[in-house]
Amino acid sequence: MSAETWPPRYKLHKYWGRKPANVVARSIEMFTEPGATVLDPFSGSGVTLVEGARLGRRVAGFDLNPFAARLANATLSPPSPADFEAEARRVIAEVRSRTAHLYTTSCDACSKDAVVRSVGYAGDAMIEVRYRCPACKASGAHAPTSRDREIAALRVPVPEGAPDEDILFGWEMQKLKRKGVRRWSDLFTHRNYVTAALLRRAILDVAGGPCREWLLLSLTASLAQLTRMIADFSGDAGGPSWKINCYWLPKSWQELNPVWYFENRVGKSLSAIRDLVAAGAPFAQGGCAVADSRALPLADASVDYVFTDPPYGGEGIQYGELSMLWCLWLAERQDLSAEVAYNPFRKLDHAHYASGLGGVFRECHRVLKPGKWMTVTFANKDPLVWSALMAACEDAGFALVTTAPMRRSAPSLTETNMPAAPKEDMVLVFERPRRSGVAPARGPSD
């Protein structure tokens, strides 16, 4: 199978390791008919659920990560484009009026006030101020002036309720620990932290429902860009974004104007909403629950098909840790101790990972109808991790039927910079054989 580029409906938010929508959709169409029930026990951002619902299937997703569940459910239930655009404009106008003075510089062309778009830094030293002038429409950049430095140093009050807490130093936070970063607010410049918190407060004033949820997720989708984690790349490195799967503070970095980049993100969210609505959303055929898939709340033999992309183990992506900043700003808490992962910094060893996979796939076997199919996508170069996956599926009672490579549309930055990183996923198709009995249900502690 060959992956295609992502359709606009997934532009709402970044999520690590997301599988290509066309591969998921093709698999669902191949193994089910409309009206069938499709399960994803590691549903993540909800691609299986969205593609299944779009194709007229009932969907059931489960994930321990509350951020993932909120993203999946929001994607299934978008607001109307007009309502979202109107509320977004109100939020942006309100916060821009309160923070414009924090992002002002002088235009080199006409000497009038211009809007700071970004500021380049080398360590703590301000190197370059980039701007766009609303008066003469010029875009430019200059070395920082005394005025630029004075504005950047302003200590305006932090809004009440601004999200913050001590950082849990798991695997993906070690670069921060070595830099002496201790609290999440330390990732931001002062003015960016204040502005991001004002955006959040303005969004929370929106009446509850899909508009507010999509605005909140548009903000969390922007959060990394509002921190000091955005490298000041040059050349063909692409736009400013969170490019590597860890928290870090690059030596050369950019301070981006939060309102400017939130407005850009809103445009992407609006594109996603329009694509989803054109595909038939909001969908009412199911959703994602925050639950442990080692104890699925589903009846025996009640599912027609399973499609899932389990956590990779070994040195794979730490989904829970990489969602912690997003969860903080959504006022969500995760139970990281139950995560199916390998993480020596949180004392989750390979046995914990293998046991977790085994418990989930036993439950998949229990709820899948005899003679039906399960598709698993997986990528890892560690034979021990592959052995854990295959043992989990086979010990649960599944029979491997076929495998095929899934070629990606483009390599990630991690794949480009790390020769040992897997270059393609494998697609594995299993069957629950037609036989009497089902795998016994197991609790999360088994």
Model-flagged regions — what are they?
Residues M1-L39, A53-A299, E315-R346, V360, ...:
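Nucleic-acid modification enzymes, centered on SAM-dependent nucleic-acid methyltransferases
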Residues P34-G35, E332, E363, L368-M374:
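Short glycine-dipeptide loop
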Residues F42-G46:
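Class I SAM-dependent methyltransferase "Motif I" SAM/SAH-binding loop
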Residues V50-E51, A392:
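Hydrophobic/aromatic ligand-binding patch that stacks against planar heteroaromatic rings
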Residues V306-F307:
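Hydrophobic beta-strand segment of the Class I
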Residues L336-V340, K372-F378:
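Conserved beta-strand signature within the Rossmann-like core of class I S-adenosyl-L-methionine
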Residues A354-P370, D395:
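A short glycine-rich, Lys/Arg-flanked "PGG" loop and its adjoining helix->strand segment in the class I
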